[in-house]
């Protein structure tokens, strides 16, 4: 097996700039952000469901971490450069050896003091149901002795709310205008209590999925009730 790549920790100033920038992106798009629960400051593996590119923006707006991304993103203009300097862990789904390297890189990142976000479904969903969680990468938390934090991502908007989802062959440039046309969109982050890495990865994976499922019951994408849409929603201080 080849040696794991050297994991680059995010530069000290960059996460702060990304937090401000991410909140600015949501402000520009008119997306409100709300948080529930507490994401620990200690290094943790954040295990989330996946709806859209807005998921990453939401997490970066509230918590300092890096994340696992497919290698193709590295070639995207601007986004690829930012991701590389954030210390993103690249993975190649077409190569089995890449999985072992990704696990080693996540472990090294956690041991180095940085939390890692992974989307356990392995792809984006349409928000109607939770897809099966893949357990392989959660092995890294067991090796590093880091807690697993289930993170449920939900969203609401006035119809057509499914414009928040990024599915199929839709490109990022096609998705952004759809999100801009939404009325009263809101993204919610629901952090469940941390799970100690004391069990095998398959048990941990099921526990994480169950926690996310409880917080996305009824669908991760919901139509907003216009009568309840007047209050200004701010990011929870607990997630700051």
Enumerate the predicted regions with their spans:
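Catalytic core of membrane glycerolipid acyltransferases/transacylases, capturing the structured
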Residues: 2-13, 26-28, 42-96
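A short, well-structured juxtamembrane/interface segment
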Residues: 17-44
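A cross-family acyltransferase "interaction/gating" segment
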Residues: 79-80, 128-207, 218, 225-226
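A membrane-cytosol interface segment of integral membrane proteins
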Residues: 89-110
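Polar-ligand-bearing catalytic/cofactor-coordination segments
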Residues: 90-92, 192-197, 211-214
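Catalytic-site beta-strand/loop segments enriched in glycine and acidic/polar residues
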Residues: 109-138
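Cytosolic-facing loops and C-terminal tails of multi-pass membrane proteins
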Residues: 213-240
